[in-house]
């Protein structure tokens, strides 16, 4: 792993790790959305679980769309940035605008489509930033480690933030802002031309 911190790779390694961590941190916070719907919106637990399930079903198409767009229309870096920004806008609408169950379903579905869908190209983008002999190490550090830390800390952070600031501000701080910051971090990474991948 120390080779990733040599001068040639350090900046790229840290940017990828930080971007991935922030993204996973925000994603991890959304694991508590059922609790948000039952506490902040006072929904029945069955309705809260249903809307999460339906939205994840919609989100599955986001993975496919991101893969197609990242492979054939845009480069992967730009797909991640676009999907993250669209996902953050939908997240804002989910928390601050949507009121009815149907409105929530639409914007939550859009959030999962874009925000979660970016993961279809993120791992590949991390790997293609490094030569073949470093890809497994880079993917484990800047990818898997960052994801596990984010998934672990995100739910803890939203429970703390919701208790201290309320659910809407909590999700703004712990969910929405980290997605936008991750998108900005990915902007600092150079696009990888397809011919340089292999």
Predicted regions and their residues:
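C-terminal transmembrane helical hairpin of 12-TM major facilitator-type secondary transporters
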Residues: 76-122
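A late C-terminal transmembrane helix in Major Facilitator Superfamily
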Residues: 127-164
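Extracytoplasmic gate region of multi-pass secondary transporters
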Residues: 8-63, 151-154
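Helix-to-loop junctions at the C-terminal end of transmembrane segments
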Residues: 64-75
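Multi-pass alpha-helical transporter architecture, strongest
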Residues: 125, 175-198
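A membrane-interface helix-boundary motif in multi-pass transporters
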Residues: 160-177
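Helical-face signature of the major facilitator-like transporter fold
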Residues: 19-20, 24, 107-113, 144
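Hydrophobic transmembrane alpha-helices of Major Facilitator Superfamily
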Residues: 25-29, 60, 101, 113-121, ...
């Amino acid at each position: 792993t120390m080779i990733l911190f040599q001068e040639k790779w350090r900046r790229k390694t840290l940017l990828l790790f930080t971007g991935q961590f922030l993204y996973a941190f925000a994603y991890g916070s959304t694991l508590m959305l059922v609790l948000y719907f039952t506490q902040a919106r006072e929904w029945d637990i069955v309705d809260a679980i249903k809307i999460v399930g339906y939205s994840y079903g919609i989100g599955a198409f986001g993975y496919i769309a991101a893969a197609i767009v990242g492979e054939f229309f845009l480069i992967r870096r730009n797909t991640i940035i676009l999907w993250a920004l669209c996902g953050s806008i939908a997240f804002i609408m989910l928390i601050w605008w949507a009121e009815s169950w149907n409105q929530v379903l639409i914007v939550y579905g859009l959030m999962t489509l874009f925000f979660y869908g970016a993961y279809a190209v993120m791992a590949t983008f991390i790997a293609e930033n490094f030569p073949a002999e470093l890809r497994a190490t880079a993917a484990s550090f800047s990818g898997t480690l960052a994801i596990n830390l984010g998934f672990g800390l995100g739910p803890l952070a939203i429970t703390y933030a919701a208790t201290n600031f309320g659910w809407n501000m909590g999700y703004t701080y712990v969910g929405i802002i980290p997605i936008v910051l991750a998108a900005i971090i990915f902007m600092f990474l150079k696009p990888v031309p397809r011919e340089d991948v292999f």
